[in-house]
């Protein structure tokens, strides 16, 4: 009886679970869970270009099954939604579960009166190294952008560049300031042209120009966005070894995991993969066969804190480090949670950081700080992020889609 009484006293009953879709420049899906004590938790469920599917999954299926549950029982709730649906994994399901998990960790940390990273086991480092994005229509423009970010103090810098003879430049911002937004508003995605031959010929010239001008002081990163075949990626990785890249990201579509063996046979350029992954099962082979160096899974798409902890712990056995996806199509709620996770996780590598527009940060008041290339979550209890519902309501959902790519002959390709 005494044990039952103790359990009941520690029970933190969920009384409300609400879903908000707001577009302060771009669409975000936010879950807010409230307990009977009035403690609230926030979770991010944003899935770029498929936001309403996740919002419906939460609103129609998960939220009703949260009411009356004990918010402390995070693991049980995670398993209930993962196993209980019967249909497992996939981006919509896992983004919804991720938001629930994030919100429950926010609540638990607030109830404990601790910032989340303390609850996870405390800080493993003083700050979180983040990498920024730089690009330009030409090499000169890209070098100018690099210099600007170097002056801001970034220690890790991603470089992209327009390729002569191609109309569109991957990585060019449509948003204001640091808020990069590749999605185009409207009912139809933008179609972009891609030429692997032009890319392979030109891109090493960019890295050469960067290293010649700025030296090797910063970590240099590059995203290939799934566009090369395995043998092309092997050739490319080998050709850029002298530039000592921190990583080449998504060199080829990762569904065919065996093909990374071919890339590994030919190059020691480090490889980062996983932003489109949704569970540890997507990562398992690449990690245990040492086919990658950084795992790019993110809290919003891979099962929240609970899912990401499993992935990171497994990766640590093989000295694979985290390099979480973090563009501005994940909301500030995810960024806040990621910084707590990054402060704690022993096998941390780097965190992607793109910044947000003022509009976005007004809707999501935050507590993190950036100082000379490193970020910190702050020490407020929970995630240290808030959500202004009234302001969010002024920015209703607007259809927007990521681009698609076609080869010069019209064949649909990987964007």
UniProtKB/Swiss-Prot annotation:
Q: Which InterPro entries match?
A: D-mannonate_dehydratase-like, D-mannonate_dehydratase_GalD, DgoD-like, Enolase-like_C_sf, Enolase-like_N, Enolase_C-like, Mandel_Rmase/mucon_lact_enz_CS, Mandelate_racemase_C
Q: What does this protein do?
A: Has low D-mannonate dehydratase activity (in vitro), suggesting that this is not a physiological substrate and that it has no significant role in D-mannonate degradation in vivo. Has no detectable activity with a panel of 70 other acid sugars (in vitro).
| Biological processes per GO annotation | amino acid catabolic process; carbohydrate catabolic process
Keywords tagged on the record: Lyase, Magnesium, Metal-binding
Site Important for activity and substrate specificity — annotated at 327
Looking at its record, which EC class is this enzyme? lyase
Essential cofactor(s):
Mg(2+)
Q: What reaction is this protein's catalytic activity? A: D-mannonate = 2-dehydro-3-deoxy-D-gluconate + H2O
Cofactor detail note: Binds 1 Mg(2+) ion per subunit.
EC number(s) stated in the UniProt entry for this protein: 4.2.1.-, 4.2.1.8
Which gene produces this protein? rspA
Q: Which family does it belong to?
A: Belongs to the mandelate racemase/muconate lactonizing enzyme family. GalD subfamily.
User: What's this protein's name?
Assistant: D-galactonate dehydratase family member RspA
Q: Where does substrate bind?
A: 48, 133, 275, 296, 325, 329, 352
Q: What is the protein's species of origin?
A: Escherichia coli (strain MS 21-1)
An example of a Pfam family matching this protein is MR_MLE_C
Picking any one GO molecular function of the record gives:
mannonate dehydratase activity
Which positions are catalytic residues?
170 (proton donor/acceptor), 225 (proton donor/acceptor)
Q: Does Magnesium appear among the keywords? A: yes
Which residues are recorded as binding Mg(2+)? 223, 249, 275
């Amino acid at each position: 009886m005494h044990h039952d009484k103790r359990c009941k006293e520690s029970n933190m009953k969920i009384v409300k679970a609400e879903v908000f879709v707001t577009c302060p420049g771009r669409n975000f899906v936010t879950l807010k869970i409230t307990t009977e004590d009035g403690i609230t938790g926030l979770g991010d469920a944003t899935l770029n270009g498929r936001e309403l599917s996740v919002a419906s999954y939460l609103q129609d299926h998960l939220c009703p099954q949260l009411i009356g549950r004990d918010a402390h029982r995070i693991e049980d709730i995670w398993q209930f939604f993962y196993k209980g649906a019967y249909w497992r994994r996939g981006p919509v399901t896992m983004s919804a579960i991720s938001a629930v998990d994030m919100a429950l960790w926010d609540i638990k940390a607030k109830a404990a009166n601790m910032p989340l990273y303390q609850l996870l086991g405390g800080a493993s480092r003083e700050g979180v190294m983040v990498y920024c994005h730089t690009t330009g229509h030409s090499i000169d423009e890209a070098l100018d952008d690099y210099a600007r970010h170097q002056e801001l103090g970034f220690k890790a810098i991603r470089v992209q560049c327009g390729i002569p003879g191609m109309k569109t430049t991957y990585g060019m911002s449509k948003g204001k300031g640091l808020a990069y937004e590749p999605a185009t508003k409207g009912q139809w995605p933008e179609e972009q042209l891609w030429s692997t031959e032009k890319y392979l010929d030109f891109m090493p010239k960019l890295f050469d120009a960067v290293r010649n001008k700025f030296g090797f002081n910063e970590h240099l990163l590059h995203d290939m966005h799934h566009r090369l075949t395995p043998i092309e990626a092997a050739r490319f990785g080998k050709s850029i070894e002298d530039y000592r890249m921190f990583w080449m990201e998504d060199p080829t579509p990762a569904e065919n995991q065996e093909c990374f063996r071919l890339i590994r046979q030919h190059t020691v350029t480090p490889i980062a993969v996983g932003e489109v992954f949704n569970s540890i099962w997507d990562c398992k082979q690449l990690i245990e066969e040492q086919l990658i160096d950084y795992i790019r899974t993110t809290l919003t798409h891979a099962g929240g804190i609970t899912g990401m902890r499993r992935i990171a712990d497994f990766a640590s056995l093989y000295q694979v480090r985290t390099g979480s996806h973090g563009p501005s199509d994940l909301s500030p709620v995810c960024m806040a949670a990621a910084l707590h996770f990054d402060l704690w996780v022993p096998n941390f590598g780097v965190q992607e950081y793109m910044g947000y527009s003022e509009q976005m940060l007004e809707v999501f008041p935050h507590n993190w700080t950036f100082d000379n290339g490193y970020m910190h979550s702050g020490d407020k209890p929970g995630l240290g992020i808030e959500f202004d519902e009234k302001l969010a309501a002024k920015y209703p959902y607007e259809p927007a889609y990521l681009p698609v790519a076609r080869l010069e002959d019209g064949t649909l390709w990987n964007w």
